[in-house]
From Swiss-Prot:
Listed GO MF terms: structural constituent of ribosome
Annotated GO biological process: translation
UniProt name for this protein: Large ribosomal subunit protein bL17
Family matches, as Pfam families: Ribosomal_L17
Family: Belongs to the bacterial ribosomal protein bL17 family.
Subunit description: Part of the 50S ribosomal subunit. Contacts protein L32.
Lineage: Bacteria, Pseudomonadati, Pseudomonadota, Alphaproteobacteria, Rickettsiales
Keywords: Ribonucleoprotein, Ribosomal protein
Record-level GO cellular component terms: cytosolic large ribosomal subunit
Keyword Repressor appears in the UniProt entry: no
Length: 142
């Protein structure tokens, strides 16, 4: 019986599933729109919305440390959450992301979906928050 089972297993062990969700959420926060399979997108949506809610309501040292511990210590993503996304969604009480069905994948006919942040910055799609990029810019200036 499947009583009180809310999460999908996605054919992975717990550690792999949590790591995959963390990586997908980092990509979604960076690019504000990603294409993935439909079950992964449906599982990712509440996961990311909790991060945005923490960034909105707990814009303190404790909130920053919570986000850092849950996002692989990626400081650039946490800074974007606290500075950009928290201020963007300050008036909203939820529903920060949307999942739209896409086509099927050619290789295995898996149903694909686009998950994106509502009121997203269209120019953020190609940009990557990367530490190496900042180091290269500093090196070329000097």
């Amino acid at each position: 019986m499947k009583h009180k089972i809310k999460k999908r297993k996605l054919s992975r062990c717990t550690e792999h599933r949590l790591s995959m969700l963390k990586n997908l959420s980092i990509s979604l926060i960076n690019h504000e729109q990603i294409i993935t399979t439909l079950p992964k997108a449906k599982e990712l949506r509440p996961y990311v919305e909790k991060f945005i809610t923490i960034a909105k309501n707990k814009n303190t040292l404790h909130g920053r440390r919570l986000l850092l511990s849950r996002l692989h210590n990626n400081k650039l993503v946490v800074d974007k959450l606290l500075n950009v996304l928290a201020s963007r969604y300050q008036g909203c009480k939820g529903g920060y992301s949307r999942v739209m069905k896409f086509s099927t994948r050619k290789g295995d006919c898996a149903s694909m979906a686009v998950i994106e942040l509502v009121n997203r910055d269209v120019t953020a799609k190609g940009k990557v928050c990367d530490k190496n990029k900042e180091k290269n810019e500093v090196a070329t200036k000097s």
